[in-house]
Every structure is written in C-alpha cells, then in structure tokens.
Amino acid sequence: MTRDENGCGVFHLTDRVYLTAADVRALQLAKAAVAAGVQILLAQQGLSLSALDGLYLSGGFGMYLDPASAAAIGMLPRLPAAKLHSVGNAALSGAAQLALRGNMSAADGIVNRLTYLELSGRPDFADAFAENIPLRSMQWR
C-alpha cells in the first residue's frame, strides 16, 4: 500500500490498477442506496423475497454487475440465478419497440399500471440507507 498526494491510502492491485478509500466509499454509498431501495420497494408492496418471480437489473449497472458479488456485500438479496435477469438498456429497448410498432395503447396500459415511488425524502429510506452502508451480507426479509 502507498499514499497518494493527499496522504490517503492507495492499495495497488497491479501496477496500473489500484483502489482508494474514495473508491470504497463510493461502493458503500451505491450499495446502501440499492439495498435500501430494494428493501423499501418490497415493504411498500408487502412482499417477501420468496414472493418475487424475478429481479430485473437494467442499464450499465445491470449489464456489468456480478449478482453473486453484489449479494456477498449485501447490495442485492441472494436469489437463485434463475430469478436474476439482466435486461440491458430497458428504457431504450422499450422506446425502440414502441417506435417500431407504434402501439401507443400498449404503452398507455403499462404507464397506467406504474407507481412512482420517491425514496429520497422518506425517513424509512434514510434509516435503511444508513443500515446498509457496511459491506456485509444482509439478512434480507
């Protein structure tokens, strides 16, 4: 381990790849936000993990995330591999399908079934976020 120009520790994985305290903190914050979000969504719907048919991971996050590693640090619940689905850029794919098919009534039907849930101002989210900062596997409910 060495120190950077600010005196912060730098852990070298190779001569060109290294990990800093800022990297670990960014991981902790992302992990806490995702885990808290999943917990709040489940609680909001009154669901347990066993009731889920699947967990869909989208965008660059979903494409490159290793679900086993994410579960090991508590970012995601431990689920059977068959219940974890990486769907790529779902928003772009959906928009492209809509543009090609021109079926606005189907899109309206989906929109009418959606519920927007703002997490940032919720006290239960703040509590779950703080609880999920440590990098450890969680006992998901």
Feature locations, PLM:
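Helical "lid/coupling" subdomains associated with nucleotide-phosphate turnover
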Residues: 1-141
